């Protein structure tokens, strides 16, 4: 057996969404900050293509690279690689990374609660892990500041006509639309159609509405979040949502950044206040338990500090290798399993 590289991976999923973690075999990319390192990976694409493209990966998968932190407050940094993006932050991936760090012993576990500070490309996140019998059972993450951008904005979408949408940031940028507006329900049997429509809505939102983060160089809308109406019981709101991820797949989890963005919109519309909780439910019925912890400002914009909480499970370990005679050193994509990214 011969290989010019060996990458060590711990497999993991958070409430159904795959978020594998590279724990060895990759040197930290160049950059003075984790954000700059993530931009190198986004522009270079060599590593992302190797771990995500067939025959080693697939469109279903996200992969996280552990890197030494740049901020002295943090114990570890990580960079998220998605099929088409290298985002500032991800809720499900931060939960996977935290679980792998503790369950594998990379960071020492303290029972019943372990506190960590991690550095995502989008900023510092605080982690509280509930641990028992050597397992991180639930991860709570204080996400980066989140904010609503546009509320009730008209958007013209080919095949749908004019729909009303919100745009918001929850660690990544979203256009948010109610499922009823597009004549659909969030259920597994409509996953392909919803994902394709969601990507179409994202494209239209970038062309007609745009987005600009007040502090980061993030100038596009990444995802379409499709929602069903929120219900309230006391100080707890519950809502089903799903997120269409380019090129055209569904997030299997409730999407932590999406829940954060949705809470920011609910707060901006006067439907949620500090201290109240939000349960986000995925297309699979899994849940993230969230809280609008406090209200703040970000670059002069009203914002919130959200906390997201969920579970993750280690699924295995693997080693990715590259034989020097392999005709596909960067992998490949075919549209039967990897939708066209238009």
Curated annotation (Swiss-Prot):
Name of the top EC class for this enzyme: isomerase
Catalytic activity reported: trans-4-hydroxy-L-proline = cis-4-hydroxy-D-proline
Isomerase among keywords: yes
The EC number(s) this enzyme carries: 5.1.1.8
One Pfam family per UniProt: Pro_racemase
Catalytic machinery residues: 90
Record InterPro entries: Pro_racemase_fam
Subunit structure: Homotetramer.
Function: In vitro, catalyzes the epimerization of trans-4-hydroxy-L-proline (t4LHyp) to cis-4-hydroxy-D-proline (c4DHyp) and that of trans-3-hydroxy-L-proline (t3LHyp) to cis-3-hydroxy-D-proline (c3DHyp), albeit with very low efficiency. The physiological substrate may be different. Displays neither proline racemase activity nor t3LHyp dehydratase activity.
Record protein name field: Protein BMEI1586
Lineage: Bacteria, Pseudomonadati, Pseudomonadota, Alphaproteobacteria, Hyphomicrobiales
């Amino acid at each position: 057996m011969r290989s010019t590289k060996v990458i060590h991976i711990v497999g993991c999923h958070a409430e159904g969404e795959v978020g594998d973690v590279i724990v060895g075999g990759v040197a930290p990319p160049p950059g003075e900050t984790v954000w700059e390192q993530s931009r190198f990976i986004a522009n270079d694409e060599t590593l992302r293509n190797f771990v995500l493209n067939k025959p080693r990966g697939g469109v279903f998968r996200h992969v996280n690279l552990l890197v030494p932190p740049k901020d002295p407050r943090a114990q570890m940094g990580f960079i998220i690689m998605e099929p088409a993006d290298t985002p500032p932050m991800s809720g499900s991936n931060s939960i996977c990374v935290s679980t792998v760090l503790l369950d594998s012993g990379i960071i020492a576990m303290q029972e019943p609660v372990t506190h960590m500070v991690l550095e995502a490309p989008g900023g510092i996140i605080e982690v509280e892990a509930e641990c028992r019998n050597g397992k991180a059972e639930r991860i709570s993450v204080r996400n980066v500041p989140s904010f609503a951008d546009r509320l009730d904005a008209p958007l013209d979408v080919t095949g749908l006509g004019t729909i009303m949408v919100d745009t918001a940031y929850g660690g990544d940028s979203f256009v948010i639309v109610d499922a009823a507006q597009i004549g659909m329900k969030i259920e597994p049997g409509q996953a392909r159609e919803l994902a394709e429509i969601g990507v179409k809505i994202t494209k239209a939102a970038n062309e007609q509405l745009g987005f600009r983060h007040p502090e980061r160089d993030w100038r596009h809308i990444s995802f379409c979040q499709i929602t069903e109406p929120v219900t309230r019981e006391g100080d707890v709101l519950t809502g089903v949502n799903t997120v269409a991820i380019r090129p055209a797949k569904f997030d299997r989890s409730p999407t932590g950044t999406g829940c954060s963005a949705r809470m920011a919109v609910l707060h901006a519309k006067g439907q949620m206040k500090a201290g109240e909780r939000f349960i986000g439910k995925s297309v699979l019925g899994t849940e993230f338990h969230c809280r609008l912890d406090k209200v703040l400002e970000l670059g002069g914009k009203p914002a919130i500090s959200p906390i997201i909480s969920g579970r993750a499970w280690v699924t295995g370990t693997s080693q990715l290798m590259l034989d020097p005679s392999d005709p596909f050193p960067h992998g490949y994509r075919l549209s039967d399993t990897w939708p066209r990214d238009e």
